[in-house]
Design a protein with these regions (language model features):
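N-terminal low-complexity, Ser/Thr- and acidic-residue-enriched intrinsically disordered segments
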Residues: 1-66
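Short loop/turn segments at secondary-structure transitions that flank enzyme active sites
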Residues: 23, 69, 76-80, 176-179, ...
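A conserved cap/lid and substrate-binding interface adjacent to the catalytic center
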Residues: 37-143, 160-167, 190-192, 199, ...
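Gly/Ala-rich beta-loop-alpha elbow adjacent to hydrolase catalytic centers
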Residues: 144-148, 152
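Active-site signature of alpha/beta-hydrolase-fold catalytic machinery across serine-
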Residues: 154-158
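The feature captures the conserved acid-bearing segment of alpha/beta-hydrolase catalytic domains
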Residues: 163-248
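Long, charge-rich alpha-helical interaction segments
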Residues: 246-248, 253-259
Length: 259
């Protein structure tokens, strides 16, 4: 059971950080990047999104800090190769924590999670280990959307299961199922302060299918965007749709505004 409670204001703040991760990517990964909310950039996050063995690291998010508070923001899927990997549905043993099996595409993405655009740079979990080693970090929040939600989930269990930070807080939007029953149970025990915001119309939240052995982690926060946005698969999945459903002052994507 969660040790804390779901906070709309916290969800909205973290959602803005994930939107900033998208902006970082669409802007072409500029050398100068300032996180929102007065936070300072610690490092960007990169991952290899190519399945054929050819290195092609792209920026997926960032780690930011403000005093004792650290936020990790991870964007969702962009591009055909990422979508292909999203939906392989092949389970593999999760290599970083004894926690059952996870979907292969998500696991491969996570295995390439580094702080630079090649595999010689530190892994993201190791960067967090260094950041938290001095004992000055009091809160660690991890947030993601779509594929970024799966990656946030894997990062959180790696962090908690390997003694990097005992009690990360996780907010995900439009998360797919990440692993099997053993994984979900282990995750829920290690990372109880997790809130998985799920739009009832978003197909991604129903994948990979349970008949393939996949189980969602806790704790679901259901929302319904029926009266908010155009009724399309894309609009139901957009991060701005999620945030607008939580708070109507957040603008929808222009293509999703109802006529």
């Amino acid at each position: 059971m969660p040790l804390a409670t779901f906070s709309i204001s916290e969800a909205l703040q973290l959602g803005q950080f994930v939107l900033a991760a998208y902006d970082l990517f669409t802007a072409g990964d500029p050398a100068v990047f300032t996180p929102p909310g007065g936070y300072t950039l610690v490092t960007k996050i990169y991952a290899d999104d190519i399945t054929d063995g050819v290195p092609d690291y792209k920026v997926f998010g960032f780690i930011a800090r403000s005093g004792p508070d650290v936020i990790v923001a991870i964007r969702g899927t962009e591009g055909v190769f990422e979508w292909i990997m999203d939906f392989l549905f092949i389970p593999v043993l999760f290599p970083y924590v004894n926690a059952g099996r996870t979907e292969r595409g998500f696991t491969n993405f996570y295995s390439s999670f580094h702080t630079g655009a090649d595999s010689s740079t530190p892994r993201v979990v190791d960067a967090l280990r260094t950041l938290t080693a001095g004992g000055t970090v009091q809160t660690l929040e991890i947030a993601g959307h779509s594929l970024g939600s799966a990656l946030a989930t894997l990062l959180a269990i790696d962090v908690a299961g390997n003694g990097v930070f005992a009690s990360p807080t996780v907010y995900t939007f439009a998360s797919p199922r990440v692993g099997d029953k053993v994984f979900a149970g282990t995750y829920d025990g290690l990372v109880p302060n997790t809130w998985r915001v799920a739009n009832l119309n978003d197909i991604v939240t129903y994948l990979p299918p349970p008949f393939a052995g996949y189980v969602h982690v806790d704790s679901e926060v259901p929302i319904n965007s029926d009266d908010r946005t155009k009724h399309t698969i894309s609009c139901w999945h957009q991060l701005r749709t999620y945030l607008n459903t939580l708070d109507s002052s957040v603008a929808l994507d222009a293509d999703c505004v109802p006529a």
